[in-house]
Amino acid sequence: MKSSIIKTGTMLAGFLLAACLSTHAEIKLPAIFSDGMVMQQQTNANLWGTATPHKKVTVTTSWNRKQYAATADKNGAWKLTVATPEAGGPYTVTFDDGTQKKLNNILIGELWLCSGQSNMEMPMKGFKNQPVENANMDILHSKNPQIRLFTVKRTSTFTPQNDVVGSWKEATPASVRDFSATAYYFGRLVNEILDVPVGLVVAAWGGSACEAWMTADWLKAFPEAKIPQTEADIKSKNRTPTVLYNGMLHPLIGMTMKGVIWYQGEDNWNRAHTYADMFTRLINGWRAEWKQGDFPFYYCQIAPYDYGIITEKGKEVINSAYLREAQAKVEHRVANSGMAVLLLSLIHISEPTRPRLI
């Protein structure tokens, strides 16, 4: 009898403890806000997350010892902005709603989003039989704590997500070899020229269509873009309209940054007649959702390639110059944008072991 009472009391105590703990939700932050991150310098940078509903959340930044506060809504969501200084660090940011959470080793500098398809996704170590020129030496000498890397895991979804899978890493031979070559070389140059920390967030998927990085609303002007109505309509994880916006871009929207670099267009080579309008809509859409004005949006002209290699037998080979023409139109339509001309490069060539990126 006595043991039964003790057992019952223990179970009741455990239940009450669990109930008490469940009423106080731990502060949770998106993966992009984590140890080792880079925040954009000299601005009001967004931070957000979840906590106990209706609970006050305070954020303290070590660079100025200021405290900022927000109140979580009924769903536990909160958001605020913090003033960032000139480039520097490392710093800490402390979150508190009764229980503290601290982010360490934070740098302030230039933060860039890098997106597109395979020429953006391709790592420094290269693809099979497609090495990156000079990559071995560049990887060997890549250690630089001022350059931070974040790769968004490939994610294709029917509905918009609130977080991504990924983590911040300092530039070292081990991290750089698996990181986007295009993004790394861009970031390395920015770091060398400006002598400030650089953060690079890569959200890219080889073979992805422009339509996959857009919302259904933006695509209304393009009836040939078939918007999935159910999960079953997603026939291609990287080409179906909206799916990469939902899974890889939507969670990042609002991340205060310097700008975007974009390398995509190859998948749209046979739909060049719509690309200028579609790409313009993508840029305007991203800027509207970010609410950060006309941030820089730089993109790469598609490189030379014999598209006859991938054209179905019996079908007309469409000249890729039409897509380049469409790309060229965009920088004249869109403020604060620019195109890197690659027509004379040897990125896509027929010899199987020649470098793909130069």
Where are these regions (language model features)?
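Alpha-helical scaffolding within the catalytic cores
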Residues: R239-P251, D277-G285, V317-K329
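Short, solvent-exposed loop/linker segments at the N-terminal edge
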Residues: M37-Q41
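Loop/turn elements at helix/coil->beta-strand transitions in domains of secreted/extracellular proteins
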Residues: E110-L111, P145-Q146, L194-G199, M255-G259, ...
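Bacterial Sec-dependent N-terminal signal peptides
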Residues: M1-E26
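Surface-exposed loop and adjacent secondary-structure segments within mature catalytic domains
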Residues: M122, K128-T172, L194-L244
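Single conserved hydrophobic/aromatic residue that forms the stacking wall/gate
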Residues: I347-I358
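Structural beta-strand segments of beta-rich domains
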Residues: T43-L47
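Extended acidic/polar, glycine-enriched regions
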Residues: W48, H54-P123, F127-Q130, D195
